[in-house]
Amino acid sequence: MKIFIIISLILTILIIQSKSKECPCSNVELCKPLEIGPRKEFIGFSVNSTFYPYYNWDHLTTIGIFYSEDIEDELLCMAKTNGVRLVYSAFYPVEQLSNETYIDQWINEKLELVQNTFTDGLNFDVEYPITDPIVAQQYTQLVAATNNAFKSVNLYYQISVDVAWDASNCIDYRCYDYLGLSKASDFLVVMDYDMKLDGYYFKTCLASANSPPSSVLSGMVNFTKLGIDESSLVMGLPWYGYNYPCIGSNYTLQTFECIIPPSSYLGYNCTDASGIEINYSIIMNMLNDTAIQNGGVQWDSESESPYFNFIDLFSGTQHQMWFDNPDSLTIKVNIARTMNLRGVGVWNIDQLWDDHSLSSGMWGALNSFFKIN
């Protein structure tokens, strides 16, 4: 989830008129909060208000709204018909965590928004560095207060929290109270992507996988070591990749190592900031574009992830694309199934367009979480 999207969303939400509109569905029962208890989850994060006709509804349970436009009436009715919750992303300014007046107003505004738009809850997406244990506790208290306020109105409202991929090492300086957050909410969505953070002293940076299964597994295990129940953990996975420029000229389209420019982030030298995020549909179109020279999709057995080299049309230089496909996603979904996690999720479900041949495998990989042994 990207901060610039969240900031835009919160500014828009705060100016939404408080007047409730009439139910747009032919069946007015669909405008009531979904009365569905705890279940296995497939949460899809949406950044586009118009792509919902392309969704696969077979196992989708929750859609996280990360755009500023109003929710389409058709989407609302379609989601509720399929038993899918709609929840708003919720960004909260860390500097206001000790301001009780601000907190009360914020919670009331969010509750009013959800009630007036016939939706089903909030997804907290606070990704700021927090290293002070007192501030971390204040964040937990905010989530708990929000959850209590929502549940006092309707027990079926859903409150979830997005967290970094590993709870043990203060990833991105997010030293949150993860156990407390898991108890204060319905579940945590572990963002198992953007994992490329290589050491402080690396002299040579190499392109690499966005979401290696070994790191996904170790991160999840570390959450459980804190005492967090597996039923409170949802594995969030990427439907996108990173396009990295390769420095130098001694490359072929079959070269494995791609040296990339250093890109400092929170003290790390080698991060995915050296690349450009590319959605899955565009990646597939690039592979099928005869004007783009590429070496074909390769498989890195160590990171269990696909990649390919190509010649950039604009610069004429070699690039390397690391991404996820149905094969790599299935490996991680199997980890979620084996660990008996609460569910899986995707950032974001608007990465696939109307080409069924491209999208069916990606949806199928996530839907495999629900298969019966």
Swiss-Prot record:
Stored SMART domains: Glyco_18
UniProt KW Transcription regulation keyword: no
Residues making up the signal peptide according to the UniProt record: 1-20
Entry EC no(s): 3.2.1.-
Compartments where located: Lysosome
Residue stretches making up the GH18 domain: 21-369
Keyword field contains Hydrolase: yes
MF (Gene Ontology): chitin binding; hydrolase activity, acting on glycosyl bonds
Record key words, sorted: Glycoprotein, Glycosidase, Hydrolase, Lysosome, Signal
Catalytic residues identified in the record: 127 (proton donor)
Positions bound to chitin: 53-54, 82-85, 128, 191-194, 347
GO biological process: oligosaccharide catabolic process
Principal subcellular localization: other
Gene3D superfamilies listed in its UniProt record: 3.10.50.10, Glycosidases
Function: Involved in the degradation of asparagine-linked glycoproteins. May hydrolyze of N-acetyl-beta-D-glucosamine (1-4)N-acetylglucosamine chitobiose core from the reducing end of the bond.
Protein name in the entry: Probable di-N-acetylchitobiase 1
Species this protein is from: Dictyostelium discoideum (Social amoeba)
Classification of source organism: Eukaryota, Amoebozoa, Evosea, Eumycetozoa, Dictyostelia
